UniProtKB/Swiss-Prot annotation:
Monomer. Substrate binds at T13, A14, V15, G16, K17, T18. The record marks T102, R128 as: Interaction with substrate tRNA. This is tRNA dimethylallyltransferase. Residues 36-39 are annotated as: Interaction with substrate tRNA.
Length: 299
């Protein structure tokens, strides 16, 4: 079976994945698929660092604004939606470029997180039943024992992540439809942390507070409201924190999230990282994609 070539851009939040994705889409006739668990939600634009209207006009984006904030979204949903988007993009002779930081979603797509194929479905069912009998404390203890970090922890995500870890050997042998080139972006920790702090400041200047307040007033308990970028501001709305304290909390949580993202990508995906401050960074990445696609450099 001829596998479909796709480019996947990963890295911590605020590292510049969107800009690189657009650059590659322009250079290699590509379209972008968002691999971010929060960008699927309509009306949540600033806190999710969604591609701006200008950026979406520069390159076609998929899997953005496809759910209402009242709806849930899972790794399974992402796999189904991403597979459809990839097929659509390829059918028009274009290159699928997945840009995102939700490691569980990306691994689900690339490694068969549906737990089908060669995996013993009865064994999966039995293991799932075992996990469902555990209380929250014991379930999250299992995560720690297996060195699993997941974003926006809840029982469903925890159980699915443990299933993936339990049946990893079978999944590694399963046939996948894609041949990915995984491009990792990173840099010195302080560079990333400075970029995160600056991004949070820009978000607040651009209206994040109003966006978070709307979410808090209308849908404070939905899945979307638990994402980093919103819940940190809720204490400010009820007078439990000053805006400066809430902003600092948001920066701190985002930095911690970036660290967890890097840990996930290093431990779970075959990725080599490129420093975004390297003088030849853009050219190196473009050359890698060109080689991957078997194209010659234009003179």
């Amino acid at each position: 079976m001829t596998k479909i070539k796709i480019v996947v851009i990963v890295g911590p939040t605020a590292v510049g994945k969107t800009a690189l994705g657009i650059s590659l889409a322009k250079a290699f006739n590509g379209e972008i698929i968002s691999g971010d668990s929060q960008q699927v939600y309509r009306q949540l634009d600033i806190g999710t660092a969604k591609a701006t209207q200008e950026e979406q006009e520069a390159a076609v984006h998929h899997l953005i604004d496809i759910r209402e904030v009242t709806e849930s979204y899972s790794a399974y949903d992402f796999v189904q939606d991403a597979q459809k988007a990839i097929s659509d993009i390829v059918s028009r002779g274009k290159l699928p470029i997945i840009v995102g930081g939700t490691g569980l979603y990306l691994q689900s797509l690339l490694e068969g997180y549906h737990l089908g194929g060669q995996v013993d479905q009865e064994a999966v069912k039995a293991y799932r039943n075992e996990l469902e009998q555990l209380d929250d404390h014991d379930l999250y203890e299992r995560l720690q024992v297996n060195n699993i970090t997941i974003e926006q922890v809840n029982r469903r995500r925890a159980i699915r992540a443990l299933e993936l870890a339990q049946f990893a050997d079978e999944l590694e042998n399963a046939e996948t439809a894609y041949e990915p080139l995984i491009i990792g972006l990173n840099d010195d920790r302080q560079v990333i942390y400075d970029r995160i702090n600056q991004r949070v400041d820009r978000m607040l200047e651009n209206g994040l507070l109003e966006e978070a307040k709307w979410l808090y007033e209308h849908y404070p308990t939905v899945q979307a409201s638990r994402g980093i970028g919103y819940k940190e501001l809720f204490p400010y709305f009820v007078g439990e924190m000053t805006l400066a304290e809430a902003s600092d909390q948001l920066k701190q949580n985002t930095r911690r999230f970036a660290k967890r993202q890097l840990t996930w990508f290093r431990n779970r995906m075959a990725v080599s990282f490129t420093a975004i401050t390297a003088p030849d960074y853009p050219q190196v990445v473009h050359d890698r994609v060109r080689d991957f696609l078997g194209q010659k450099e234009k003179s």
